[in-house]
From Swiss-Prot:
Gene Ontology MF terms in the entry: N-acetylmuramoyl-L-alanine amidase activity
Lineage of the species this protein comes from: Bacteria, Bacillati, Actinomycetota, Actinomycetes, Mycobacteriales
Annotated region (Peptidoglycan-binding domain 2), positions in chain: 105-160
Function text: Cell-wall hydrolase that hydrolyzes the amide bond between N-acetylmuramic acid and L-alanine in cell-wall glycopeptides. Is able to lyse whole mycobacteria, release peptidoglycan from the cell wall of M.luteus and M.smegmatis, and cleave N-acetylmuramoyl-L-alanyl-D-isoglutamine, releasing free N-acetylmuramic acid and dipeptide.
GO biological processes: cell wall macromolecule catabolic process; cell wall organization; peptidoglycan catabolic process
Gene that this sequence comes from: cwlM
Protein name: N-acetylmuramoyl-L-alanine amidase CwlM
Peptidoglycan-binding domain 1: region residues: 18-83
Amino acid sequence: MPSPRREDGDALRCGDRSAAVTEIRAALTALGMLDHQEEDLTTGRNVALELFDAQLDQAVRAFQQHRGLLVDGIVGEATYRALKEASYRLGARTLYHQFGAPLYGDDVATLQARLQDLGFYTGLVDGHFGLQTHNALMSYQREYGLAADGICGPETLRSLYFLSSRVSGGSPHAIREEELVRSSGPKLSGKRIIIDPGRGGVDHGLIAQGPAGPISEADLLWDLASRLEGRMAAIGMETHLSRPTNRSPSDAERAATANAVGADLMISLRCETQTSLAANGVASFHFGNSHGSVSTIGRNLADFIQREVVARTGLRDCRVHGRTWDLLRLTRMPTVQVDIGYITNPHDRGMLVSTQTRDAIAEGILAAVKRLYLLGKNDRPTGTFTFAELLAHELSVERAGRLGGS
């Protein structure tokens, strides 16, 4: 199947006409998301394959929804990449680990799923052939008497097809994530957290009018991150920011920073924008893809954060969603992105420029992290866990630990 190509930086949308549109149409047709349209059989007219028409727009939106992408009908970098990844089927190419330029695709995801069913792979089924996939493949090859070279070629494929039809299992990654949370205990002190404020550097985002004067979207998110960082540090957590004030790294760079720190959790803060001024509310996102792979702890934390922020601020509940954005799929720890409101909406904007609202959001996120590690024990109703109670609980856990060790 052909994979779409375009000039870097270009994005295609309804009404555009180019050769790249023909390739997008072919890619979606091969995936079964668009009918063959060389000729309209009802009228006998040829369809303009280079035209990005309304029917193609609907197919692109359906594809984006299925793949956990932003559903806007625009074929930009992320959607192009997803179309290319979706074009690969296991066996169509040789799979191996490429340092600096890892392979991505649905064929890699299928390989990961089969190795996971056989008990060799415990990571997320994310379609990324990294070191964890390489090591799992080599372990499988050694176990089954194959050349342990980490290359998924014809012989390894035949073996996998034979065994995969006989073995299926649960999600070792979910079990591993849950065990890490359980074994780390309910105490927040010592937990390592990456806080990721959006925008930064020359990317100021939109400017809002606050009580003390104009405030940019970047400054608003930085202020919220600082409030959250201060509360976490006061409770004994080890906190790191994903960027300085003068930089706006890409999502991949932010994920790399979190991985280098070896964080337990990553919490990303964003404002949402929309051309419609009516769009409003808060939403939280975790890793989840069309292969059925989900970050269980990421989903649990996103759910806690969503409920806490809604309860404390009264912002509209736009719910929790699984997505495949780089920030969520490239991090090696549970990661949640919180869109704290629509800065383009007058009501949300008026709330977000208020320091009281940002305090409430910061305390809600901290309470959500605490509830994640409590695992249901000594929990509080949503929206009622105060900062003073969190401090008191940390002291009681520390005191109990000292008494138990004496």
